[in-house]
Structures are given as C-alpha cells and as structure tokens.
C-alpha cells in the first residue's frame, strides 16, 4: 500500500509498505479521505508537541472497516466509519472527567502512531464511530474537526442570544461559525487575512469580515457597538490575535483559545484581562463530541463544502502540503482522496 511518512522536519516521503495487521482490539480500515489539519502542517515543520518521527500523519479521516482482531467490533466489518484520534486509557482521572486529551497515557493517531495518510490504517475498535449510509465519506472526514469546534464552543459556554466573534476563518474557524449557531449564538464578525476565506465566512451569513491587520477587529467593535462580542473564539494561533481578542471582547466577556502556534509566543497584556474581568479558557481536541458531530453532519445542519477546498491524490502530497502551507488559492483545507 501507499503511505505518506513524515521522516523528519520538512521531510515527507511517499512509501510503499505492507498492509498492517490489526493487533487484538484493533480494526483494519481502508481509508477513503483525510484532510490536512493545521497541526499536521506544524508537525511537518517540526514545531508541534507530542509527536514521533517517523510516522504516517493524518487524523481527520473517513473510511471503511475491512477486518477486526477480536470479537469486539465484528459488526463493523463492511461499515463506513470515522475515528477519534485520541488513544486514551479510559481509566485515569482525566478520562473519567471527560477530558481524554489530558490522559496520563495519551497516544494520538497521526502523531504518536501511524495515521490516515495511507491506503490502510489500524485503529483501536473503541475509537471507531459508525456512519449512517446517507453520510458521504468525503463529508465525513470533517467529523473530527467539527467535534473540535463543538467542544470549543461548549467549553466557552456559548448560550442562545450571545454575540461571538471568530478570529481565523480556516477550516476550524468556519466550523466554529456554524457550531456557534447550533448553540443559538450569533456570529457578528470574523477576522481573517485571506480574502477567499473571508468570502467563505460571508457566504455562511457572517455580517462582517475584516482583514487580518492588527487592530482590525478592535476597530470594528469600536465603530459599531452592536458588534462588540460577548465571546471571542481565537482560532488562528497567531500571537497578535490573542491580544486583539482580549481587547475586542466586552468587559466581563470570555475569550477562547482554540488555535495555537508553538513556534511563536503569544502576547497577552494581563492588565486588559484583569481590568475587564475577563475569562480566558483554552480548548483542545474533540473532547466527547464525536457522536454529536456525526449526527450533525448527517442531518445537513453544517456545510463543509466551503472547507474542503483542494482535493489531491496521495501521489501529489508535496503540492497538497505546499498549497496548505501557503494558503494558496484561498485554501481552507487540502484533503487526500485515498481511493482516487
């Protein structure tokens, strides 16, 4: 089978290897689609956390079960599935509290063990979620990022009627816009430097989309009091955006840190947080929102067509990574069709 391998920082190679055999409690999955996440790009550049070289990347995927090793999951053979990247123990205090991304023995598909940028992969049966037959596999590869967005919105406690601004309109940012609406909130503005991504946000009904220049969102909120948000969700990870989120949100409001970049230190003035009595809260990963994300996508309540902007065969991995890294041609998500 073909498999993309990250061997070292900025060194990706397409390999041919045997189809892996599932260990006890695992399933063999034939991958259909895998989208390229911002964390994959940071991993490629060597500036991510908790990863191991060499490894097959990829954690936003869909596919179908070919085989299982053991009695559990036998009913999944032949079914279309997605899967949680989080390989947690299920028994530690963090897992028991519903925060598996903080597991004391955490592993992650596509980071510490081989992921979905391959024609086949092995996945713990416990991580698999079956898909309804009506949900296309291309759409289903966005279950994981949608779960990330739902988890972030819920961690910030967005309630009906609240106004929310989103910083960054890449894949996660555009899903945050729709997740806020699912919870009854109103997205009043998006800040994004790439024109095509701003256009995608406007197409989703966001009333205002400003550029990524420092101060653009703050200027908007000062010129239009109705645009002052109760919550700002920062999804870009850029250092200046964190401080701008703190300045743009209303006094007593909440700031959610969803994106981050290890290679650059964020700048946040504590006095703004203290004087405005703000709540700043972080969110990472899908949490426990995987099943809901499957149901939401199957219902058609969230549109992912604007996210999946550039399709590639695995043979074209170099171009896929380049387009995603440069955000060329309005790229929001490069994705691989593993069955092309």
Curated annotation (Swiss-Prot):
Highest taxon of source: Bacteria
Keywords, alphabetical: Metal-binding, NAD, NADP, Oxidoreductase, Zinc
SUPFAM superfamilies associated with the record: GroES-like, NAD(P)-binding Rossmann-fold domains
Cofactor info, note text: Binds 2 Zn(2+) ions per subunit.
GO MF, any single term: oxidoreductase activity
The UniProt record lists the keyword Cell inner membrane: no
This protein's pathway: Metabolic intermediate biosynthesis; 2-deoxystreptamine biosynthesis; 2-deoxystreptamine from D-glucose 6-phosphate: step 3/4; Antibiotic biosynthesis; neomycin biosynthesis
EC number: 1.1.1.329
Xref: Gene3D superfamilies: Medium-chain alcohol dehydrogenases, catalytic domain, NAD(P)-binding Rossmann-like Domain
Role summary: Catalyzes the oxidation of 2-deoxy-scyllo-inosamine (DOIA) with NAD(+) or NADP(+), forming 3-amino-2,3-dideoxy-scyllo-inosose (amino-DOI).
Similarity remark: Belongs to the zinc-containing alcohol dehydrogenase family. DOIA dehydrogenase subfamily.
Name used for this protein in its record: 2-deoxy-scyllo-inosamine dehydrogenase
UniProt organism field: Streptomyces fradiae
Lineage start: Bacteria, Bacillati, Actinomycetota, Actinomycetes, Kitasatosporales
């Amino acid at each position: 089978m073909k498999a993309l391998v990250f061997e070292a920082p900025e060194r990706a190679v397409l390999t041919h290897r045997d189809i892996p055999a599932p260990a006890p409690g695992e399933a063999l999955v034939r991958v259909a689609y895998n989208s390229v996440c911002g964390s994959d790009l940071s991993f490629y550049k060597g500036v991510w956390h908790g990863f191991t070289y060499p490894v097959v990347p990829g954690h936003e995927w869909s596919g179908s079960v070919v085989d299982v090793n053991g009695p559990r999951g036998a009913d999944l053979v032949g079914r279309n599935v997605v899967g949680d990247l989080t390989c947690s123990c299920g028994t530690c205090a963090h897992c028991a509290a519903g925060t598996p991304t903080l597991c004391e023995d955490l592993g992650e598909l596509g980071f510490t063990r081989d992921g979905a940028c391959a024609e086949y992969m092995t996945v713990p049966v416990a991580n698999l979620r079956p898909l309804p037959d009506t949900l296309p596999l291309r759409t289903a590869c966005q279950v994981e990022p949608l779960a990330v967005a739902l988890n972030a919105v819920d961690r910030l406690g967005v309630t009906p009627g609240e106004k929310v601004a989103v910083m960054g309109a890449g894949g996660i940012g555009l899903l945050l816009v729709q997740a806020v609406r699912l919870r009854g909130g109103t997205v009043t503005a998006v800040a994004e430097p790439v024109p095509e991504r701003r256009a995608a946000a406007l197409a989703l009904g966001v009333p205002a989309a400003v550029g990524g220049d420092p101060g653009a969102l703050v200027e908007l909120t000062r010129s239009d009091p109705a645009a002052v948000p109760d919550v700002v969700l920062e999804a870009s990870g850029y250092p200046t955006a964190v401080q701008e989120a703190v300045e743009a949100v209303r006094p007593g409001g909440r700031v959610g840190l969803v994106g981050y970049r290890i290679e650059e230190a964020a700048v946040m003035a504590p006095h703004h947080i203290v004087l405005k009595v703000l709540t700043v809260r972080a969110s990472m990963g899908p949490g426990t929102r995987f099943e809901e994300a499957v149901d939401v996508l199957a219902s058609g309540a969230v549109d992912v067509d604007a996210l999946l902007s550039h399709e590639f065969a695995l043979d074209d991995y170099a171009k896929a990574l380049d387009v995603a890294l440069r955000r060329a041609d309005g790229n929001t998500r490069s994705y691989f069709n593993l069955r092309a």
